[in-house]
């Protein structure tokens, strides 16, 4: 209750301050200096692209080869684990398993942190920049990223901590510390764990909450016809209360919500995409031909060649499915199992759902829409359609509106659901990282929730 009151007072204070100066501007001014420093270190470029993309994709390819394509060999097994087919086999003689949630709940929680507005706006941006060929490389990156998820989530379960009350604490903070200690690099492990925890907390405040809340507020204001910062603050207040009620109950309540919301929102979006694709059945073959052709022989304006399109697709996929980021292993660590690798198998389904399925669906809708020549591929990420500039989610919305009357209501619902689910998961990631740094007591718990 104290947490909820604090959240309300904070947001009311922000809404009052926003009358003097825009809230977005205040936040930008406060965090810009620190953000610039971190961006320069983390996203330094090599050949015009962030080095972290080379690292993530290279690691994914390495794990795929070393483990002999687990993304393909164990795909069916992963589905069976999620279905609970092997639950009896996972029981020990004492008939007990550490953990707090089921395989499906852990998967739903992790997927809710990755399937977000990037699947709507990010894909549109990638296609606008690199053309249809970017879709091919997104799919490739998603497929090999499955192997990375397999590795990091197996480690998350293997090195997790379980307290006397059965509460689980896991993620990169723990497997970096324990794993590197086993190999004689104890100090390096501790430093790496602290750096990850700090970055994860920052991510939970920024991209995990603030950015998602902001995007949801924008689409709701547009739909309702409001154009004030105060309206955005009130929408943020409602979202904060909703998310706060959920996360205050811990991983069990989070999992019970995500196991219902994630399948619903994913199915809703996929069905809408399938309706549009099915309504244009004759274009499907041409769309896939264009995706493959443009992947190796791009014609988008301003695209330098195959490597440029490849990097655009890889960049979008890597940041969409978060393979290699380590965040998903925090959710998967809470699973009820005595076999770490079983949850690694479950985790490899995430990039497939996020990138290979949902991102590809969005891409096909946009590509089919543009067979009419609505806009030119390439440029700075924005496209002109009938003399109006569209960017990100606006491109996707325009494509949907062409085939589904009143689609703004559907897309607004999708964006809000995606945003809320991402906020829920990333709040959990943040609080787990916070507890690693400042202890697992009630005070540390309340301080984070107050700040979030």
PLM feature segments, named:
Residues 71-101, 125-127, 131, 135, ...:
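Flexible loop linkers connecting adjacent transmembrane helices
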Residues 2-113, 117, 128-134, 145:
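N-terminal alpha-helical transmembrane segments of multi-pass membrane transport
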Residues 90-127, 155-179, 195-201, 305-352:
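Alpha-helical membrane segments and immediately flanking helix-loop junctions
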Residues 63-64, 112, 141-166, 177-214, ...:
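Helix-loop-helix module between adjacent transmembrane segments
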Residues 55, 63-80, 192, 196, ...:
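Membrane-interface loop-to-helix entry segments
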Residues 184-188, 192, 412-452:
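C-terminal membrane-solvent junction of multi-pass transporters and transport-like membrane proteins
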Residues 141-152, 235-251, 262-282, 315-316, ...:
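Selective recognition of specific alpha-helical transmembrane segments in multi-pass small-molecule
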Residues 152-160, 164-165, 272-290, 298, ...:
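Extracellular/periplasmic helix-exit of transmembrane alpha-helices
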């Amino acid at each position: 209750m104290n947490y909820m009151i604090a959240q309300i007072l904070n947001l009311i204070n922000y809404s009052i301050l926003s009358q003097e100066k825009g809230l977005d501007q205040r936040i930008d001014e406060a965090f810009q200096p620190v953000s610039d420093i971190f961006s320069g270190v983390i996203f330094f470029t090599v050949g015009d692209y962030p080095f972290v993309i080379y690292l993530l994709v290279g690691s994914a390819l390495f794990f795929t080869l070393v483990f002999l394509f687990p993304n393909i060999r164990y795909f069916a097994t992963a589905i069976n684990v999620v279905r609970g087919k092997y639950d009896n086999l996972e029981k020990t003689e004492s008939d007990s398993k550490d953990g707090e949630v089921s395989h499906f709940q852990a998967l739903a929680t992790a997927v809710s942190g990755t399937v977000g507005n990037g699947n709507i706006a990010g894909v549109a941006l990638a296609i606008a920049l690199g053309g249809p060929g970017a879709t091919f490389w997104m799919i490739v990156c998603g497929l090999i990223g499955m192997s990375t998820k397999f590795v990091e989530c197996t480690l998350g379960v293997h090195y997790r901590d379980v307290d006397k009350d059965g509460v689980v604490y896991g993620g990169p903070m723990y497997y970096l510390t324990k794993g590197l200690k086993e190999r004689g690099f104890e100090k390096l492990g501790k430093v790496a764990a602290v750096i990850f925890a700090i970055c994860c907390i920052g991510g939970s405040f920024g991209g995990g909450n603030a950015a998602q809340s902001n995007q949801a507020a924008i689409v709701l204001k547009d739909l309702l016809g409001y154009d004030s910062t105060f309206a955005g603050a009130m929408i943020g207040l409602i979202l904060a209360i909703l998310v706060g009620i959920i996360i205050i109950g811990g991983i069990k309540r989070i999992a019970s919500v995500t196991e219902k919301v994630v399948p619903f929102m994913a199915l809703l979006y996929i069905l809408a995409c399938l309706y549009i694709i099915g309504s244009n059945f004759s274009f499907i073959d041409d769309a896939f031909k264009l995706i493959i052709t443009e992947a190796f022989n791009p014609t988008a304006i301003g695209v330098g060649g195959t490597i440029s399109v490849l990097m655009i697709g890889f960049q979008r996929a890597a940041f969409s499915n978060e393979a290699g980021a380590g965040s998903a292993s925090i959710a998967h660590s809470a699973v009820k199992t005595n076999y770490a690798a079983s949850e690694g198998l479950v985790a490899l389904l995430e990039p497939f759902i996020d990138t290979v399925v949902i991102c590809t669906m969005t891409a096909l809708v946009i590509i089919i829409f543009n067979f009419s020549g609505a806009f030119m591929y390439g440029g700075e990420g924005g496209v002109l359609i009938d003399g109006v500039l569209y960017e990100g989610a606006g491109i996707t919305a325009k494509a949907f509106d062409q085939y589904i009357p009143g689609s703004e209501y559907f897309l607004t619902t999708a964006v809000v659901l995606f945003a809320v689910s991402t906020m829920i998961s990333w709040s959990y990631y943040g609080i787990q990282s916070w507890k690693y740094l400042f202890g697992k007591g009630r005070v540390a718990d309340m301080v984070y929730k107050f700040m979030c």
